[in-house]
């Protein structure tokens, strides 16, 4: 039976029991000692593929650990699950849908059937539609109501319609097409709308309304505000079509808004929002970096898709990263995972991976609705590396929690300044090294004595300078951030998340927890505005409503 129909109790599997026993044997394992004892440790636990180099040698693992984790992947049927994902089977069981973000990266000529229909012609038809629009805007042929060419594009969307595209367009800023600036409007907070429109001219601005339903509250409210702003700036209803296009599956609602049917880019129910940057949701990416670079992004993701599907688990980046996450979350008690990019342009990757990982694997029931038998997705957090060193890295080094980390760093900078990049790279490596090595009491005391500090002060200060070490991390190195390598990097994390969902027996492609807040939000809004007079379901919410109503002005 398919894994999504009959999820297992992973804790009852022999491979899980073997890992439990191995974890006890690893209680006193020291990475420092392991490196000293084995000069080949680095080469044994590194991997290169798809333009990415992965060093996972600074982990609480031996070759036996890797073998046992791979054994777990095999025992849960990961290979069959990967094949089910790629074949378009309904792996999103709660909604009865496939999850075919990988299809968006497949080359023209491939065939893939969903409900008996080959979807690949439609995928490439939309890609051609994107190509046409991007060409017209970049060539200055798409003009606003005063016949001036478009200079600014605003993507109105939230969640997956925002985080992925923003990550990619900013990560690839060095590839940006000159003459067109891309902006993102996600938050319903009016301050964000105000600050953005202060920088724009309506006559040269194009808005992309990205919403599958064309009914997402935040997106629709911002689209309505943008429309009102456009009209107030001198635009007309008759010329609205020049300034608004949509990415949606609800054509009727988009047309009613004033968008022409030929300017609506379709979405499919077999692509989830957090996996959708490869689709027409990626239109702002293509406008930002050009169509050839957008296709390189897709190509890089496709190479990772092939690697994930075909590489043996022992040499498979997404599989290994997923298994390491299971190792720490389920056997070492880790509750969170840090993403630490040492690259200014990758500063938003943590936000995208938060949604990708936490919305996918933040589940407490298995595919069949029964409770999970173990912890599932971790909290994902982090930020730009050097900045973090002067903020929260202290917790990583001397805190009481075990927090695995991924360091991501390029070898070459697009903007070299003196020896800055050498220092950036050195900082990245030294942080992972410090997490692994730590500092012993003996080393701390010797360091203080070398500074001529009196012995009584040495004994007082030494405990504060001890750093436990033995803290795990992965280091991902790319030669330089490019569309192809970035595509591979993002796809790698997508597949890592899927690996973990299969092991835990959960559905990585629904998000019912998000819906409850939306439903309750309508009732709260109605009570805030006086449209609903009945009390809220609880005294706390009602008290906060009353507090707002008694003080709100404007």
UniProtKB/Swiss-Prot annotation:
Its main location: cytoplasm. Pfam families: PGI. GO terms for molecular function: carbohydrate derivative binding; glucose-6-phosphate isomerase activity; monosaccharide binding. One of its GO terms (biological process) is glycolytic process. The active site is at 359 (proton donor), 390, 518. It is found in: Cytoplasm. It catalyses: alpha-D-glucose 6-phosphate = beta-D-fructose 6-phosphate. Catalyzes the reversible isomerization of glucose-6-phosphate to fructose-6-phosphate. This is Glucose-6-phosphate isomerase. It comes from Pseudomonas fluorescens (strain SBW25). The lineage of its organism: Bacteria, Pseudomonadati, Pseudomonadota, Gammaproteobacteria, Pseudomonadales.
